[in-house]
Amino acid sequence: MGFFSEEFLSWLDQHADEIDKQSCQAGEQLIEKIAAEGAFRVGISESLGGSGVSDQDVIDILAELAQHSLTASFISWGQRTLIDNILHTDNSYFKETYLEKLLSGEYAGATALSNAVKYLSDLEELNVRILEENGQLYLKGRLPWVTNARRDQFLTIFVAGFPDDPSTSYVVAVPSDAENFSRSEDLEFVSLQGGNTAALTFNKVLLKEEWILSKDAHQFLAQNRPAFLGYQFGLAFGLAERSLSEVEKELGKRSVLTDEWKHQVEQLEAIRQELYRGLSDRSYFVTNPRELFQLRIDIVDVVAQSLLLELQAGGGRGYFSKSTSGFIRRWNEGAFLPIVSPSAVQLRHILATS
């Protein structure tokens, strides 16, 4: 028994290819439709407007979405990750002003922490700087790739640093109606086009004190990394599950693939159990991040092998442009997972050098 209503999943299946290939009205509606199902309230205490349960349930919901549309799952990951950061800041402003708006989908949550993840691993400089003029702080810079940044009413979270003090960086969240803050046209991708992905520019945006989630980005992000990375597994789990399900339907005619199918099913379940075991104690992956990084690398390989199996099981029919199998969409979606920040290559680099 899944979490989502049959009515919603039917709508999502009907629009999945359109959302994948186009910047469209269905894509604009997606966050609110997912929110209407109560998805973003899972894993949040009832006292804050949630429905309780755990991080595992959040991942299961993202996996269910990914079985139907990776775009839907990815923007939901961004939404839920931003919510998680708001829940773990000492700054009450965001809980009081934006939490319910994010839970209901009135506001979209654009998580733009990929630059920060690379920065904290000494792989990249911060894209947004904090400038001080006449006692005021301003944001100056550009985030080149941010998903779930709708045309209006979104909140974006990122890390900005002081150019003259590289050791100091802030985690900040800025609303889309901030003065001197602009959004580009949608970036053009081969897949996930309906995810409202754009570049965001800060042209001396006045940094208000209430927008600062933490003045110690290193510590804040390290504490919240298990959820940031852990929730991403939902995308991979769902895509692999759908692919392996499609393979299973063909095993009667393609029995030669049975052993390999069983192996991938076992690998998927082993990774899932290791992840859930680590997330059951929020501090475990904080102190053992290498284990989380390796699991993330491993799940990318499982998705790739599952998709290759699906191609072999389905044969040439999935390659026709008018095929209704959804395979080519899943194939393109699968190509996105190795490059989601932190990418598989970045994680390999961290493991090799630390």
Where are these regions (language model features)?
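Amphipathic, small/basic residue-rich leader segments at the start of a protein or domain
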Residues: 1-76, 285, 354
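C-terminal helix-coil-helix/basic helical segment that borders enzyme active sites and/or dimer interfaces
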Residues: 16-22, 249-252, 269-304, 308-322
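A short, Trp-centered hydrophobic/proline-enriched beta-strand micro-motif
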Residues: 34, 40-42, 104-116
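N-terminal glycine-rich flavin-associated loop
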Residues: 70-92, 122
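A gly/ser-rich beta-alpha-beta helix-loop segment of oxidoreductase catalytic cores
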Residues: 108-131
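A short core secondary-structure module
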Residues: 145-181
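Glycine-rich beta->alpha junctions and the first turn(s) of the following alpha-helix
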Residues: 187-269
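Glycine-rich phosphate/cofactor-binding loops in nucleotide/flavin-utilizing enzymes
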Residues: 316-354
